[in-house]
Structures are given as C-alpha cells and as structure tokens.
C-alpha cells in the first residue's frame, strides 16, 4: 500500500488533533475531580499546537543560513565573472588596436618593398642595357 506525502502529513495533523482532544478531556476530568485552585492548569493556548512551529526549527534555520551563504558566494562569483568579462573585453580592444596599427605598418612595409623591387628592376635594366 502506497501513501502520498500529503497522506502522511495529514495523518500527523490528525494525530496532533487527537492528542489535543485527549489533553482537553484530561483537563476536564482534573477540573471535575480536584477542587478549584488546588492544581495549576496550563491555559489552552499552551496546548494548541501552532502549525508553523515544530522541533525542526533549528535544522530549518541552519538550512536557511546555509542557503544564505551559498547565495552570497554565488553572487560574489557572478560579480567576479562579470569583472573578468569586462577586463577581457578591454584587453581585446587593446589587441585589436595593436593589430590595426601593425596592419598599417605591414602595408607601409609592403609599399616600401615594392618601391625597392621596382628600383632594383630599373637598375638591372640599366645595367643590362649598358652591357
């Protein structure tokens, strides 16, 4: 037989309700058997279980503290990654500017090389004509 998690949760609430009823009946019996003022009875508010509280509050708060720490560390890592992306973008801009400048330098060197080759060809033609 399988029970869903809701069935087990509702079963726990029913058991709490049964315990509350039994405590209430015991309190009524004590009132009927004991004279007034001879026994200090706890107010009913102390015996009514509050749905939001249980004995696992310590583990629940520990869970939330751990979750908070994980979120803070994650946020720090995200900011670090964003910082690295910005720095990498700046470095890429620098490299791009250098390559553009070097490309212009290379074009200038090619132009100078062509001028030298033309001059050498002219000199070779002059030498061949003189011979």
From Swiss-Prot:
Signal peptide bounds: none
Keyword Endoplasmic reticulum: no
Coiled-coil portions: 90-125
Post-translational modification Phosphoserine, affected residues: 24
Membrane-spanning segments: 65-85
Domain of life: Eukaryota
Membrane-topology annotation of the record: Single-pass membrane protein
Principal localisation: membrane
Keyword field: Coiled coil, Membrane, Phosphoprotein, Transmembrane, Transmembrane helix
GO cellular component, one term: membrane
Compartment(s) where it occurs, according to its Swiss-Prot or TrEMBL record: Membrane
This protein's name: Leucine-rich single-pass membrane protein 1
Organismal lineage: Eukaryota, Metazoa, Chordata, Craniata, Vertebrata
């Amino acid at each position: 037989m399988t029970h869903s998690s809701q069935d087990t949760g509702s079963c726990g609430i029913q058991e709490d309700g049964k315990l509350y009823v039994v405590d209430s009946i015991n309190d009524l019996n004590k009132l009927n058997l004991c004279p007034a003022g001879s026994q200090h009875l706890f107010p009913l508010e102390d015996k009514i279980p509050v749905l939001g509280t249980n004995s696992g509050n310590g583990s629940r708060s520990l869970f939330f503290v751990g979750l908070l720490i994980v979120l803070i560390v994650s946020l720090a890592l995200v900011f670090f990654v964003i910082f690295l992306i910005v720095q990498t973008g700046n470095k890429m801009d620098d490299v791009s500017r250098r390559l553009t400048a070097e490309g212009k330098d290379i074009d200038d060197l090619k132009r100078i090389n062509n001028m030298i080759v033309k001059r050498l060809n002219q000199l070779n033609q002059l030498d061949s004509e003189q011979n």
